[in-house]
């Protein structure tokens, strides 16, 4: 299976603007930063959450706590996968009790990753509320899950792939849509 | 890389990358043990049978908790209360467990090679939890994990394994694992408790403890297997303690940041002095915690990604 680039969805500037807007939306919806915390889903959700943290710091002058969640152990398809996923560390170095947690990921697709992340979070602590921020929502939900903050809605077909690249992981910022070719 | 074996029968023959994969997977597992809710749904619906033909507290409980923390269903079978007493063979017991849909059989047996025999005859994956005086791979792995956690590396370290090597499956798994990972291994004990074949595996053999400890980074003290000492392999326990017991004075020959390990259960005052066993530089309790993490990692690696058609 090969992937062929079809179109660029977001360049670095577009991602930066989307992060800025989401940061403002988070602050508006939660009426400030009290009890606010950000948790990125590994891998690319973590650098995006870090950028949201920096943007919120820029706007409010205060740093909100930041965590990283690995959801591998919570996946519901582990024993059917061909390739075993590598487990990374979950690092949530603050108590989730009573927090307004914003989960951050790059792409929202079937909703299974988010479901796993919700289970993982609730096993660590009991937040007051959990919200979801994603850079791109591509549709095709298999579970009743909806994002609270979306950088860009991109209607896709199931034969397409959304590729988000971030400087911290991939050495560049960008999001593109690709076609699967047999 | 992914785990490519059906079974885990020993550390001999495992590649460096495979050992690294297990140790790397164990690190996030240890975090789970430290949480209030020690449970993840990873192995929900999978069944693990601990088939123990020999007594055990920590290994059996460790495997059972590792399975439970990952939501597998675990069952313990002690040979004394099973059909073994009616004369059922190991292979037939294995086939019975297979027919019940068991995914993993964890076996401890007094006979070296018993897990290998079982693995050949069952569909279930088999984990060796100690076979005779052969191997105890999960103990070896938890020792490697503990050393790496404390020292930050395994390569280039000097590890002295001290005591009753002859009867020790822990020693053998340690030797294979440590050598694969690039550590220097020294063995030390009374010559009657040092099997001659181990000298040719590239380890250094000592009968004087002072020489064996000189500049060592890690000392792994083996349990003197008192139940097997009726063959007169050394004169008295008192003499053994005087000649080979690890105490503070002898430890001064090691590196100043020496790490002391012991697989337990300990004979305090025989192979290890009280004040050594309880010191900060000893990681004996931590080894037990790490044992659960390492076993969780192994269960995960053996059960995850089974679509790959894993091989023997």
UniProtKB/Swiss-Prot annotation, chain B:
Where do the annotations place L-aspartate binding? 86, 169, 223
Signal peptide residue numbers: none
Q: What class of enzyme is it?
A: transferase
Has UniProt tagged this entry with the keyword Transferase? Answer: yes
Keyword check for Transferase, yes or no: yes
- What InterPro entries does the record point to? Asp/Orn_carbamoyltranf_P-bd, Asp/Orn_carbamoylTrfase, Asp/Orn_carbamoylTrfase_sf, Asp_carbamoyltransf, Asp_carbamoyltransf_Asp/Orn-bd
Write down the PROSITE patterns for this protein, in alphabetical order: CARBAMOYLTRANSFERASE
Q: In which pathway does it act?
A: Pyrimidine metabolism; UMP biosynthesis via de novo pathway; (S)-dihydroorotate from bicarbonate: step 2/3
- Annotated GO MF terms: amino acid binding; aspartate carbamoyltransferase activity
Q: Which GO terms describe its biological process?
A: 'de novo' pyrimidine nucleobase biosynthetic process; 'de novo' UMP biosynthetic process; amino acid metabolic process
Entry keywords, A to Z: Pyrimidine biosynthesis, Transferase
Residues binding carbamoyl phosphate, per UniProt: 58-59, 108, 136, 139, 264-265
Q: How does it assemble?
A: Heterododecamer (2C3:3R2) of six catalytic PyrB chains organized as two trimers (C3), and six regulatory PyrI chains organized as three dimers (R2).
Q: Which family does it belong to?
A: Belongs to the aspartate/ornithine carbamoyltransferase superfamily. ATCase family.
- The name on file for this protein is Aspartate carbamoyltransferase catalytic subunit
What organism does the UniProt record list as the source?
Heliobacterium modesticaldum (strain ATCC 51547 / Ice1)
State the gene name recorded for this protein.
pyrB
